Each structure stands twice: as C-alpha cells, then as structure tokens.
C-alpha cells in the first residue's frame, strides 16, 4: 500500500471488486463502524478511522449490494458475537440493537412504513450516544442511501434483488429486443416490439424463469442471493443448513466438465462443506415425505369417490411446482380445493429442519438458516410466501439456483472435479428412488403411484417403473390397470398445456384421477435456474436419464420404505395425514390478482 494511498488503491491491491463491478460503498470497523462512499474513493485513506474499533477491516460493497440487507447482516453479526460473550460493553444497548434488527428485517420483507426510518434513527442515535461512538453504520446507511430505504418501503422493491420477499424479474437496458423472452413465456406476460426493450408484467409473472434461460444477452435481472449464503456462514451463532434438490445433482456438473446427467451429489456436499455450510441434507428425503402425505390424501379421495361421495374433488393435482401453483391461483380461483394440500418438498424440508431437527439440537428457528439449492427461480417466490413462515421467520430463509451456486464455487476457485466425495448428513439426507425422480417430468406422479397402489392393495408391486407415465409430450395421459385398480393419470409440463387441460376438466370434457403439472419443459431438470444449454432437449433427456439411473441403483425405491421417513412418523408425526402432519406439512391456496 503506497503512502497516502487511497481506498481505490487498497481495493486494487486486494484484487479489485469481484466481477469488476462498480463500487458502491466500503464499510470500515467492527463492531460499529461507518460507510465510505464514492466521494471518498480516491482520497487518501484515513487510518485513524480504525483506531477505536475492535477489528481493523474494510468490507467493500458493489453496485449489486443491498444496503438494507448488508445493514441487517452487520447487526446479526454483532448480536451473534454478543451471544458468544463478545463485545460485552454493548450489552448496555442490547435492547436497542435487537429492535434495530427487527426494523431492518421488516424493511427487507416489505412490511415497514416510513415511520420505521424515524424509529431507526432514534434507536441508533441512542446506541451511538450511550457508547460515545463517532460512527454508526445504520445511521450512515440511512443518510447516504436514503433513496434505497424509500424504494424498499414505498415501492416494495429491492433494486439489488437481494431481499427475497421483494424480488421481481426486470428486463434491463441490456435488452436487444430479440423477442426470445416473449416467445417462450407461457403466460404472455412479456411485451415489447422487435429491437426495442421489453417489459415484464410482474402481476402476471409466475417466476418460472424460462425467459431468463432464453435470453441470449443476460438482460433479465433475476436477483442474486449468493451473498446471503456467504454472510450467513460468517455470522456467529448461526447454523447454516443446505438442502439440495434432486435435479441439481445431474446438472451442476456441466459447468465443471462433467457430462449432463452425471450424478455429482457427493462432490456437491464436499464443496458446500468447504465454503462453510454446517449441514448438507437432501430435498429428496422431503420428497419421500411428500409422497407419504400425497399418496395418503389421494387414497382417501379415491376411496370416497368409489363409495359414491359426489363431494370428493378429483383429479388430485400435484402441488410441488410454485410457478404452476401461482398460475393456478391466478387463473382457476374456483378450483382451489382440487390440488393436493401437501407442501412442496422444499418447504416440507425447511419446516422439519426448523421445527423438529433443530429443536432436537437445542437450536431456535432464528439460529438456523435454511438455504435451498434449487433448479428453479420460482422457488425464490415460494420461499417468500407468508404461509411458509412463523411470524417473520420464514421456513426457507433463501434460495440459491444451480447457476448461483456455480458462481459461488467458481469465485471460490472450487472445482468439483478435484474434490473427494462426501456423504449427505443424516437423518435428513437419506432418500429413496421415488424421491429422486421428483426432478423429472412424470416423476412425482410415478413416485406417488408406487406408494398409493401398494397402500390400497396391501401387496408389493413386482414392477414399480411405470413407463406409461414417462415421455416428452407437453401433455400426455395413461390408463393404469394394476390388479383391481384402474387409474387415469395425466401429466403436463408447460403452463400452456396445463391451462388447456384444466379448461377441459372445468368444462367436464375430460376426467382424470390424478394429474402432475410442472411449469418447465422436462420438469425441474429444465428449471429456470439450471445451467443454460445449446442443445436443450438433448441435455434435458440426459438429465432425466441420470435421475432414472440413480433410482434404479438404489436399494430402496419406494418412499414408504425409507427408514428415516418411518422414524419421523413414529417419533413426531404419528402417521400420514395425522393432525400433527397436517399442521406441519400441509398448506392452503389463495386467489391471486392477475
């Protein structure tokens, strides 16, 4: 560092801002430092700023950072240190610090009003005066980035896309007007003329992300929660739990020289542990739990139907895909009692992790941070739904897509090819073949059929591979006859096809006992958060084959035979569809404005 060197010199000496992004601010000093902004960038750095601080450090924020999200992390870090008996002098203002965090949390979730900024000023002024501080980061963040607080509160928008409850897709000025996005949008919520910037109607958008996959220039802003993970890992007294969806393991390897469809789950576990995640579990385990609830619900509806109960709702519709659920809520508000009430595997996992697993370890919900590694951008929207929370503590804290995780690994110089295999943690990492095939089209209904039929007949099936349910048509149907049971099953992947099929059901033109619906081509393997591929159909088929291969190789291929699933019922939930199971694992649907 040269004598009289500037902040810009220091940043350059450290290797610059990742991705050569534009400088926004630099935070100095812990536990309560302040901000240096752009006007200080090329001035000589005043090292006296650090003399009265416990840590002499600088954290540089880029233009893609959210000030509210960072301020919230800063307070969480301080509170974590205090819980570890550090910074004891701050115990005098612990009440004010905790209230500051709660106000910032409200702002980040779109639940605040402008009076909350006034309250923040009062709280932080009390902290500053009581401790005789020169700087207070939250006060300085309000003064220097007031417009950002205002945008969060008054417009319900996080311009950096880091506050998950406020996430919206946006088409940026990179747009070349090629129309690729509008052509793939299944609900026609993207508009614009050729060679002119397009726009997205977020009131109609289902967040499926197919526009993001199609855009050739990366013009669609989808949010970025990579820093959320890294900051949670850095926060003292925070236990970071990752869950990995089935489709991720057969796609993420494509970015590291593996073939599409190659299962790299054990490398993925190793990489997540390497960056500091405390526990790595498998969403496929929760998919098995989903099957148990959904199959029992399906069995109940079938039995009532065959007894002549004309109030029973058929077909039962799968409820794993959040883009499909939002589409359904917007367009079929008169049919909200038709889908299964079972939560998605992601939300079931997060609920169990916080309310059962964490409790057994003596952890509160607030001490656990659940990050879901998903192939799907709509999962970010799902995680933000109020029904998947307890008060202001959401079951899934945030979602990273496959592409976001690739970004973290690349920036951390982690190459999956060079890692030793590591196993998932127990007990929420043990899954059956039924759970793994949730990641491809037809997989959810096939997994449920394996269990439903055996529940009804009481007999073990000789063949559990229902090839009639597999295929690549946008909508397909199959008539299954197994013993005395006859089932008419439908499968749709793509919201346009789903809409056509539901219109026929609503009009009484078609009848099915059960239908699986996924928003994306191929199901989750083709999700909007997956690696982009030039030969899309070829890659999708390889990913699907990869999941089928895992299923075939597993010793347990039926969800109801998973011993860790049996254990959770025996110890905590009693039995599928019990009152306890219904309280934790089921949800409701609501009409949405279009």
What role is predicted for each listed range?
Residues 95-102, 157, 162, 167-201, ...:
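Iron-sulfur cluster-binding cysteine motifs and their immediate structural context
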Residues 1-164, 363-367, 377-594:
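Redox cofactor-anchoring modules in respiratory/redox and cofactor-processing assemblies
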Residues 265-279, 330-332, 410, 452-456:
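Short helix-loop-beta junction
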Residues 2, 243-245, 317-320, 371-375, ...:
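Short beta-strand segments
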